Amino acid sequence: MVGVLGVAGLLGLLWLERRTALTLPTPTGSFAVGRGIYDWTDDKTMDTLAPGPGSKRELLVWIWYPAAAGQSATIDDYLPAQVRAPVLPAGGPLVFRVLSRVFGLLTRDLSKVHGHSFRDADVSPQQRSYPVVIMRAGASLEVWNYSTLAEDLASHGYVVVGFDAPYRTGVVVFPDGRVMRRTPENNPELFSGEELLSIRILQAWQVARPKATMQVEEHKHD
C-alpha cells in the first residue's frame, strides 16, 4: 500500500512539473537576440543515409544572432509547435509505443518552456559584422537543446549557426512538417572517433559556406 501511494505521489509531482511554466535563464549580454530557422539543401551532394536514392543532403539550420533593440518582433516559441509535437516511434512492439506515450505525458510540456529570442528580428546595426560560431549537438541530440548557450552567445555579439542533420540527428522536423529519423546505420557507437570527426567536419563545412552570412544579411534589409 505504501509503495502504491509512493508511486502515485511521484506521478502527481511529475504531472505538476509538466504543467509548470519555465523560462530559460536570461542572456547575460547587452544585445537582444533574434532567431531564424531554415531548411538548407545542398544541390550538389547526395545524402548517402537517406532511405531512397537521389536524395539531396538537407540540414535544418537554427541561427541565433544579435538583434536590433526596440522592435516589434514577437518572442518566438522555445520550440515551434511541429517540433514539440509528440512523435511516436515509427515501429516496434505496441507496448513500447504505449510506454513512450506515457513517458511523454509525464515529462515537461515544452509548450510551457519560454526563451528570449525574437522571431526573424532585424540584425543589430551596432556593428558592421559579427563573429560566427558553428554549433553541432553531440551524438544524436537536437541542437535546440543548447538554446540557452546559443542565446547567451548571441547576446554578447555572436552569430550562432546550429544545425541538425537528417538521419544523423535523433529526429529532425522541418518547417514544412517533414519528420526524418536517425537511421540504425548511423548509430554513433558504430563509428570510430576519427570517422565521426570527419563526418562532423563535412557537415560544418556545408554550414560555413557563404549562405549563413547571406541569411543573416537578409534581416539587415527587411
Model region roles, listed by residue range:
Residues 2-12:
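Hydrophobic membrane-insertion alpha-helices, especially the h-region
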Residues 83, 91-158, 164-222:
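Cap/lid segment of the alpha/beta-hydrolase catalytic domain
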Residues 13-133:
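Domain-level recognition of soluble alpha/beta enzyme cores
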